[in-house]
Structures are given as C-alpha cells and as structure tokens.
Amino acid sequence: MPGLWRQRLPSAWALLLLPFLPLLLPAAPAPHRGSYKPVIVVHGLFDSSYSFRHLLDYINETHPGTVVTVLDLFDGRESLRPLWEQVQGFREAVVPIMEKAPEGVHLICYSQGGLVCRALLSVMDEHNVDSFISLSSPQMGQYGDTDYLKWLFPTSMRSNLYRICYSPWGQEFSICNYWHDPHHDDLYLNASSFLALINGERDHPNATAWRKNFLRVGRLVLIGGPDDGVITPWQSSFFGFYDANETVLEMEEQPVYLRDSFGLKTLLARGAIVRCPMAGVSHTTWHSNRTLYDACIEPWLS
C-alpha cells in the first residue's frame, strides 16, 4: 500500500497543480495583431520606388508583416507620359494585388501619383481601397513656376504656359494634364483631357459611373502644407484653388464640391475625409518625414 501511494502521489500532485500551471510557466510572447491590409505606393513626377525606402522602413517598424508594394512604373522621365496612359499601366499592376486582398488595401500616392490614384478609383468598378492617402498631391491642379516646369518649358512662364498646355501637343505631357490656369478657365475646361474629367467639370458619358466608383473608397486622407514649395497653391493638396483673382478658395467653396460632381461633398458628409496639414515640410521630404508619418499616415493603415 505505501508503495502504491508513492506511485500515485505524483499524479495527485499534478492534478492539484494544474490550475496554477499558467503562473508557473514562462509567458508566451503576445501574438501580432491580425494581419494588416496590404499597402500600395504610387510615386510622383521624376520619382522611382527607391525614393520611398524610408517610408517602407516606417511601415515595417510600426506595422510588422504588412505587405508593401512600391510600384516601379513610369519612373524618371517616363513619368511625363500622359496620365491616362499611366493610369492604365498602374491599373494593370494593382488589380492582382487587390484580388489577393479580399479585406481591402491602402493606397499611398505622392504628388502627381495622387492624381493617378484618384483616376484609378474613378475608373475601377470593383476596387477595394480602404484608405486613399493623398500625399502632397495637386488634386485641384497646379499653377506655379517650378524647377520642373522651367526644365521642361524653359521659355514659358506660368502666365503663358496655357498656350502650350491647352494644345493637343501639350496634353501629351503629364504636367499639362493638371495645369489649371485660373485666368483661362474656359480653355482649361475645353482642353484638359484629364483633370477636368476626373473632377466632373466637363460632361462625359462615364461621369456617373466614375463618381459611384470613387465613393467606394473607405477614407480619403489629404496631406500637404504651406512650406511645400512645389504644389501651387499648396491648398490644392486639400482641393482648394485660386479663383480668377488668385484668391484661394477652400474645398467647401469650390464648384466641384458644391455640385458634388465626383463625390467630395458626400465623402465629407459621411466623415470620410481626413485633412492633415503640416508646416515645415518641403515637397521632396514628405515621404521621409517620420513626424509626418506618425501623425498623418500610420493611424490610417489598419
């Protein structure tokens, strides 16, 4: 009997200790948060995927395991190709990524790339974009002398660039696709083959479908600032723009908003527009500024 008791004692003690096992064993590492949605990054004028190495590091650090794709299309001078041509190329690249992400994706689109992405959201019937983050993008157009323009059109100034941009030849350059001269609005409306269409400023047979598609987006995050130095006016990053007197009218004063021509008013009404202005950031440093990332980008990468 004593021998039998000694044989059973370990089993009895094991039963008594079972409730306390979680306290006795070392704690298991906390599991990672559920998988993050894939992130697609679209670069700007004269850019390439290499420019976004810091942004890639920030995302990997704060949201480990996130699949980030920086699309390597229309790099360098190829970014001057007509924007509709670029939209088609980027569309072919993003469709397979979206198809593999039934929970949705996020878009981070920088400068000219923000216009490419807005057009993508307009023409894609089945896109599944949750956050569209427009990073210092001339969403209402550009009207300013920049080094890019001086290099491309050395004999022109912003006051007479409309003569080139609002011609069939000029519309073959991406910059002219969103050149918005407030002193020649009639020419802009008639000649713009890109911005006037995605803004719904000129009638076209796809306007209703494009608006419906754009409104599929979960959230529109607008980022820009007064020290950008390239986007002119800088409020274009927030859908503000000049009137004929070069007074800036904010988004809520713009005809495209008041008419809700492509969905801005609807998005704002449902609380789906986030505006994140930040001073002290120059145009070429938006995607490498950690403070900006933490405040304006990271919160929307679910």
Curated annotation (Swiss-Prot):
Subcellular localization: Lysosome
Reactions catalysed, as given in the entry: hexadecanoyl-CoA + H2O = hexadecanoate + CoA + H(+); S-hexadecanoyl-N-acetylcysteamine + H2O = N-acetylcysteamine + hexadecanoate + H(+)
Record's signal peptide: 1-27
UniProt cross-references to Pfam families, sorted A to Z: Palm_thioest
Glycosylation sites: N60, N190, N206, N245, N289
Chief localization: other
Top EC class of this enzyme: hydrolase
Protein name: Lysosomal thioesterase PPT2
Gene: Ppt2
